[in-house]
């Protein structure tokens, strides 16, 4: 389950628009929004791509954002 609040903070800090991030992931803006809101799950490849784009380098931060309980 994605920690929506933490992910939204990282997106805002990155300066990227959600439409740009969605395009980089091969998703529509709507598809990305559904994943951020936990309506659908991120694929491992999407998580890895977002980590690169959003400069999420620590495994702890990655886990806190994408594998929240």
PLM features per residue range, with description:
Residues 1-17:
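A short, Lys/Arg-rich alpha-helix, primarily the initiator
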Residues 20-22:
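Short alpha-helical "recognition helix" segments of helix-turn-helix
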Residues 27-42:
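Recognition helix of helix-turn-helix/homeodomain-like DNA-binding domains
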Residues 45-61:
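DNA major-groove recognition helix of helix-turn-helix/homeodomain DNA-binding modules
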């Amino acid at each position: 389950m994605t920690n929506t609040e933490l992910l939204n903070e990282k997106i805002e800090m990155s300066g990227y628009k959600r439409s740009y991030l969605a395009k980089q992931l091969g998703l529509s803006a709507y598809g990305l929004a559904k994943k951020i809101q936990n309506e659908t799950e991120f694929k491992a490849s999407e998580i890895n791509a977002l980590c690169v784009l959003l400069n999420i380098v620590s495994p702890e931060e990655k886990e806190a954002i994408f594998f929240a309980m």
